[in-house]
Amino acid sequence: KNYFTGDLLWVPIKPPGYWQFTLDEVQIGPYQMKLKTGTAIADTGTSLIIGPTKEVSMLIQSLNMTDADKNEYDEFVKPCEDVEKLPPLSFKIQGRMFPLKASDYFLPTGDGDCLLGVTANEGMDIAGVSLWLLGDVFLSKYFSVWDVANKRLGLATAVPKPPEHEMHRWHESESSTGAKQGANLARPPLTATRRDSQR
């Protein structure tokens, strides 16, 4: 409980072999994207959020971004000072909204610009299915419990990582509880259960 706030939402995964579950809706600000067959995969091996080409294009348009906002690597960027003005991006899972602030889904590049942490899965679109890969951009915001035995994923808002000067207290607490704290580096294998808290 020291690692998250509120209650865990337990989401059944399907089919066995993937951390895949039903996604009800994606929302950017007040705009809702209704998904006929919404599916999400929690993927710690993916850095960004990857979505269907059509929906990601709609998201980019709602952020008033055009090709003029692309850098030399064909990535969408905005000045970091403008990011806070942008709307939240939310994923609705089993009736509960999991929002990301703009500062969560835009990533600083170190030169004053912030990179959009959502990209399209061009060439991977599946007809009739709205498939989203929720990588580190999403998982770094939410505490996750990977329950292999019961084929379910637990999600709750993660407690922010303490400042550097308080990290020793954090690690002492970790040792006493036996819970693992830190960034996910890989999906847990299907033969074991792993419990991870994010940043």
Please identify what each model-predicted range represents.
Residues 1-199:
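Active-site or ligand-binding cleft "flap/edge" segments
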